[in-house]
Amino acid sequence: MTPSLTPGRERWLLLTLAGVQFTNIVDFMIMMPLGPQLTQVFGLTAAQFGLLVSSYNLAAGLSGFLAAFYIDRFDRRRLLLALYALFGLATLACGLAPTFASLMAARVAAGVFGGVLGTLVQTIVGDVVPFERRGRAMAVVMTAFSVATVAGVPAGLFLAAHWNWHVPFVALFGVCVGLLWGAWMVLPAMNEHLHTHAGSAWGRVKDVVTQPDHWRAFGFSVLLMVAGFVVIPYITLYTTSFHKVGEGGLSLEQVPTIYLAGGLATLFTARFIGRWVDHAGKVPVFRRMALVTTVPLMLMTQVAPLGIWFILPVSTLFFVCMSGRMIPGMAILTSTCEPRLRGTFMALNGSVQALAMGMAAWAGGLLITQDAQGRVLNYGYNAALAVCASLLAIWMVGQLRLVDAQHKTAGGPVRMVD
């Protein structure tokens, strides 16, 4: 555990981490609503676009696995600054890419660095913030998703609509430069974990992967990701495809509206859900949110022909529920490993999550089809798979063990049941 921070210093740390996550999320999320432009510019099929989206996650999965061998061997501050600088350069490369192949290569590079960044941010929260406040802390960091959907993605789409798809990535690089300077000023040295490590990196990986509890946590992560990313990457393609043939849907100019509304809603609900998690318990809140999420999952894949005034409330509820289940979900995962192995565990978990996201996005592209007029069909199959994953996650969470709870009980780690 790093030395205790004052409330003010902890707040600035969490806001800085949220800023890093903001750029990471925008870099990933902006690809999905840019789908109609990218498929037109490069002549891509839905499956090829799915591969472009999933390339980021597959690269992040591989780099996350490799990070497990070094993430606990460096000061967290220095590692985050180095990775963030490289991530910014990869984002700039996306903006300068002239061809599909070069864009694919740049997305892979962004995934290599961005995937480890996400893991590192979660690890720092787990190291710095005490267990009893971790739900609220995770909610602060996860407001990055809300701000990304409220400001980042709509701003990126505005730039793309008024110039071209390259401009959002170049602008995001500029934001990264500013945040890198801020992180260098704000982040404290975080090296206490270096004094608790015994043995080699291989030994720590072995300690993580030989514990059945950790494999259950990895399985839980897979279900979390599949439940979202078999559907999310294709929302824009699906809704705009019906508008093109005059059957409701969304125009390209209306797409930012659903991100703006969804982001504003989650901006207000995330803090409430974080407090609810700390008060009512991580597992009960997760189960309730995961069950409720199945409703907008199914509706989101059927609502396009009804037009924006039906799509907007459904998509807003969708964003709120997806964000709401991730707050307790990530708080649970950061608490399933002892502190000395948390960096290694979270690196491996980040790898598992990224691979699951990539495979889910790729599988989602294979499930949907397009008719002769370009309408996206069979999207309901994606929702059915997502609902199954959500229901399995509700069961799986009860099989996990909350290691940090040993500080609150006399009997060691406890199984996470109601």
Predicted regions located by residue number:
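Conserved MFS/SLC helix-loop-helix module at the cytosolic interface between two early adjacent transmembrane helices
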Residues: L62-P98
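C-terminal membrane-cytosol helix-exit motif in multi-pass small-molecule transporters
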Residues: F173-H193, M396-L400
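Helix-loop-helix hairpin linking two adjacent transmembrane segments in secondary transporters
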Residues: V140-W184
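Extracytoplasmic gate region of multi-pass secondary transporters
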Residues: M31-M32, H214-Y259
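Juxtamembrane intracellular "pre-TM" segments in multi-pass secondary transporters
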Residues: T2-P7, A189-G219
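Cytoplasmic helix-loop-helix junction between adjacent transmembrane helices
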Residues: A106-F145
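Helix-breaking motifs and short loop linkers at transmembrane-helix boundaries and internal kinks
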Residues: G43, D75, L96-S102, V303-P305
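C-terminal transmembrane helical hairpin of 12-TM major facilitator-type secondary transporters
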Residues: V283-P328
